[in-house]
Amino acid sequence: MQAKAPMYPNEPFLVFWNAPTTQCRLRYKVDLDLNTFHIVTNAR
């Protein structure tokens, strides 16, 4: 069995976090700076 190459070079694994963190800023004025974790959000 042969392993496939990573989807993104130099990233050993990917984490998907399905949490509406944008709502924290809009509703509660709490800004969660997730840049340290390289978390990308969408516009929804």
UniProtKB/Swiss-Prot annotation:
Main location: secreted
A cellular component annotation (GO) from this entry: extracellular region
Keyword hit for Hydrolase: yes
Annotated coiled-coil segments of the chain: none
pH profile: Optimum pH is 5.5.
Subcellular location: Secreted
EC number per UniProt: 3.2.1.35
Gene3D superfamilies, alphabetized: Aldolase class I
Alphabetical UniProt keywords: Disulfide bond, Glycoprotein, Glycosidase, Hydrolase, Secreted
Catalytically driven reaction(s): Random hydrolysis of (1->4)-linkages between N-acetyl-beta-D-glucosamine and D-glucuronate residues in hyaluronate
GO molecular function: hyalurononglucosaminidase activity
Post-translational modification: Contains disulfide bonds. Glycosylated.
UniProt note on tissues of expression: Expressed by the venom gland.
InterPro entries attached to this UniProt entry: Aldolase_TIM, Glycoside_hydrolase_SF, Hyaluronidase
Temperature dependence: Optimum temperature is 37 degrees Celsius.
Listed GO biological process terms: carbohydrate metabolic process; hyaluronan catabolic process
Pfam families: Glyco_hydro_56
Keyword Glycoprotein set for record: yes
Broad enzyme group: hydrolase
Subunit record text: Monomer.
Protein family (similarity comment): Belongs to the glycosyl hydrolase 56 family.
Functional description taken from the UniProt entry: Snake venom endo-hyaluronidase that degrades hyaluronan to smaller oligosaccharide fragments. In venom, it is not toxic by itself, but increases the diffusion of other venom proteins such as crotoxin (a neurotoxic and myotoxic PLA2) by degrading the extracellular matrix. In addition, it displays antiedematogenic activity, since it significantly diminishes the oedematogenic activity of crotoxin (probably by direct substrate hydrolysis, since hyaluronan possesses strong water-binding capacity).
Protein name: Hyaluronidase CdtHya1
